[in-house]
A protein has these predicted regions:
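N-terminal active-site beta-alpha-beta segment that forms phosphate/nucleotide-binding
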Residues: 1-67
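Short secondary-structure junctions and interdomain/linker hinges
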Residues: 8, 12, 16, 221-225, ...
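Residues that form generic nucleotide/phosphate-binding pockets
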Residues: 8, 217, 241, 245
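Short amphipathic alpha-helical patches
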Residues: 28-32, 52-53, 104, 109, ...
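Short, intrinsically disordered/low-complexity patches at protein termini
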Residues: 34, 40-41, 224, 246-249
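Feature targets compositionally biased, intrinsically disordered low-complexity regions
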Residues: 43, 51-52, 83, 248, ...
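Conserved phosphate- and dinucleotide-binding cores of soluble alpha/beta proteins
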Residues: 53-225, 229-230, 234
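Acidic/aromatic/glycine-rich contiguous surface patches that form carbohydrate-binding/processing clefts
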Residues: 227-255
């Protein structure tokens, strides 16, 4: 999943990365095909190449040691992201719906949109962190998620980070600076938003799965591209560069 996400990242992009799989995908791209990538973190560490293994935090010494600059979250999120300067980002999702809205706030028996009032969730999650700012400010962003029916929802319990809201032009009406999610890269395949409806459809699936399995693990009626294809397997070069970032294999089993 990290390699497939990394393939979506272009050389020269100004990209904000979070901890874990987000950094793995981003720095993999830098090592593999995007040497001029301009990565930065929510903590304000800009222009670094990781040393000593996968970074464990947004300000850790593995990225701060050779950074071009070291500022703060206000500069990262307030200046680079919410001004519309950031080209791309990678965020995670506990739940994602058919319009790319992401929930990382909590899980409810009866979600607030159904009851009409906010009540404490049954399960409290970590929250959006900088992903809420990213979702409204970045020119585009990528969502990484484990593909399970309980996660790929018809409608998320709570919108922590906005996608295309209710579809169509509903996002444009809010006049956000950013352009919205460009893709959902899951553990089963790649989903893209329809240009008109903004509903996510299946563009490609992995060699080890099937279209039926992807549909069975999606709560909404997932549409399939007429040109649906199989995702090419990682090359030897890609695997080598992935392991050059995550030298200890700390996240290898997760993506």
């Amino acid at each position: 999943m990290a390699i497939i996400t990394g393939r979506e990242i272009k050389d020269g992009e100004l990209i904000i990365l979070g901890v874990g799989l987000s950094m793995l995908a981003g720095y993999f791209a830098q090592f593999n095909h995007a040497p001029n990538l301009r990565p930065f973190t929510e903590g304000g560490v800009y222009g670094s190449t990781p040393v000593g293994g996968l970074p464990w935090g947004i300000e850790c010494n593995r990225i701060s040691a050779n950074a071009t600059s070291f500022t703060n979250a206000i500069d990262a999120l307030g200046f680079l992201v919410l001004s519309g300067r950031a080209d791309n980002a990678v965020i995670g999702a506990a739940q994602v719906d058919k319009y790319g809205n992401v929930n990382t706030t909590g899980i409810w028996d009866e979600p607030p949109w159904k009851t009409g009032r906010y009540t404490p969730p049954k399960v409290r999650l970590n929250g959006s962190g900088g992903a809420s700012d990213i979702s409204v400010g970045c020119k585009r962003y990528l969502i990484m998620a484990s593909h399970e029916k309980r996660r790929f929802k018809e409608r998320v319990d709570y919108i922590s980070s906005v996608g295309y809201l209710t579809g169509g032009d509903s996002r444009e009406k809010c006049e956000f600076i950013g352009g919205g999610p460009a893709a959902i890269i899951s553990t089963l395949g790649i989903l893209r938003p329809d240009p008109q409806t903004k509903e996510f459809y299946l563009e490609a699936y992995y060699p080890f799965t099937t279209i039926d399995e992807v549909k069975e693990n999606t709560e909404w009626d997932l549409k399939i591209s007429p040109d649906v294809k199989m995702v090419p397997e990682p090359t030897k070069k890609e695997l080598k560069n992935l392991r050059a970032v995550d030298t200890t294999g700390s996240l290898r089993k997760k993506g």
